[in-house]
């Protein structure tokens, strides 16, 4: 079947909602720059090659950019976005969306809702927005801003900078050098065997630094717990904090285990 920008291929599914009939369709672009727009029904938009613009609408859409530097907007609904290769910009919009960044230096905005964001190769910028998000950084020097909510951030390869945002967050970043700030909330942060910089932020945090010569800051007058690993770590703490296995401690009266 020939693929063309004007082709509305595949399914004409008739959905009766609020007494109206909605038509769901699949749109497939060309190898050049395309602009594909969804409808009120669940749509599937494929940009193919070229620098494309894909616009979802008010339903649960599937948006795939393909090769090229694409601009993808999910709008309302529970959307699945595959950015594809290239330096893409993705705005998932409201709803509990899933976004795969793909190869290239991508910008991903999760927006309101409990989103799941996957970074891929190259230096991605991943913003969770509001909601309880899950963010996976990958290889490449990624930047993660989890936003507000009880977020979970994972990184098992590559260097990463993480702003966990307000909320009681979990951060596990063990695959490269890490710069992480827990911000407000009672956070749990674990890093790996590299020379990391960790700031707990305002809240009763639990930090496990792993190996490496780490710098850890938990001076916020809250009761934090820090467990240092192999390597020589530098800790800035309060007297109410509990420090385990830490070498170079800068505080007065902290309990050192």
Show where each model-derived region lies.
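Bacterial N-terminal signal peptides that target proteins for export
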Residues: 1-9
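Sec/Tat signal peptide C-region and signal peptidase I cleavage site
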Residues: 19-26
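Bacterial N-terminal signal peptides
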Residues: 9-18
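Leucine-rich solenoid repeat scaffolds
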Residues: 218-257
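Disulfide-bonded cysteine-rich modules in secreted/extracellular proteins
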Residues: 27-29, 257
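Glycine-centered beta-turn/loop sites at beta-strand termini
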Residues: 29-32, 38, 47, 56, ...
């Amino acid at each position: 079947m020939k693929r063309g920008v004007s082709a509305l291929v595949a399914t004409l599914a008739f959905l009766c909602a609020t007494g109206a009939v909605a038509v769901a369709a699949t749109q497939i672009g060309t190898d050049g720059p395309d602009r594909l727009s969804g409808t009120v029904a669940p749509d599937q938009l494929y940009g193919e090659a070229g620098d494309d613009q894909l616009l979802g609408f008010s339903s649960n859409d599937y948006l795939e950019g393909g090769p090229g530097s694409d601009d993808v907007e999910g709008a309302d609904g529970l959307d699945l976005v595959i950015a594809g290769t290239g330096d893409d910009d993705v705005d998932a919009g409201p709803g509990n969306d899933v976004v795969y960044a793909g190869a290239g230096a991508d910008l991903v905005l999760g927006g309101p809702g409990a989103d799941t964001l996957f970074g891929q190769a190259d230096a991605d910028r991943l913003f969770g927005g509001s909601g309880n998000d899950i963010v996976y950084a990958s290889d490449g020097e990624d930047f993660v801003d989890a936003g507000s909510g009880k977020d979970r951030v994972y990184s098992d390869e590559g260097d990463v900078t993480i702003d966990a945002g307000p909320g009681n967050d979990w951060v596990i970043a063990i695959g490269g050098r890490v710069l992480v700030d827990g911000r407000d909330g009672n956070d749990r942060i674990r890093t790996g065997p590299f020379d990391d910089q960790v700031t707990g932020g305002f809240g009763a945090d639990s930090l496990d630094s792993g190996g490496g010569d780490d710098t850890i800051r938990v001076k916020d007058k809250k009761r934090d717990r820090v467990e240092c690993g192999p390597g020589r770590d530098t800790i800035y703490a309060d007297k109410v904090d509990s420090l385990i296995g830490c070498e170079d401690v800068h505080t007065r009266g902290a309990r050192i285990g």
